[in-house]
């Protein structure tokens, strides 16, 4: 199980695998079991944005267990949230905001089994 952080600019939090663009994000969603996916909207000038990632996830039916939206774009967050809310399977948790600090700590320091 992995956790994916989609962002072209911000540093990747500990415990996450960084995806810088649509292609990397979709590859990880298709090849691995993803628990937490944290999405940015703006992914660089001239590159597919977070909404295009969401559209591709829906088309491919490639979902993580939990989705968070850490983007600073209010309009982008709104569009991604609305599309995901309407299309995601019931078992996928969707949060209209960033990963909470407590969960970031938990994912950065997983309990040893």
Predicted feature residues:
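Catalytic phosphate/metal-binding cores of nucleic-acid and nucleotide-processing enzymes, i.e., regions
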Residues: 1-113
């Amino acid at each position: 199980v992995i956790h994916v952080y989609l962002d072209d600019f911000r540093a990747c939090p500990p415990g996450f695998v960084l995806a810088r663009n649509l292609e990397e994000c979709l590859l990880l969603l298709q090849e691995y079991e993803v628990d937490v996916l944290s999405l940015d909207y703006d992914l660089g000038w001239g590159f597919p944005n977070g909404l295009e990632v969401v559209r591709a996830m829906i088309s491919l039916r490639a979902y993580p267990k939990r989705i968070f939206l850490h983007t600073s774009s209010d309009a982008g967050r709104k569009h991604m949230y609305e599309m995901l809310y309407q299309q995601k399977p019931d078992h996928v948790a969707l949060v209209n905001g960033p990963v909470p600090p407590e969960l970031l700590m938990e994912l950065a320091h997983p309990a040893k089994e």
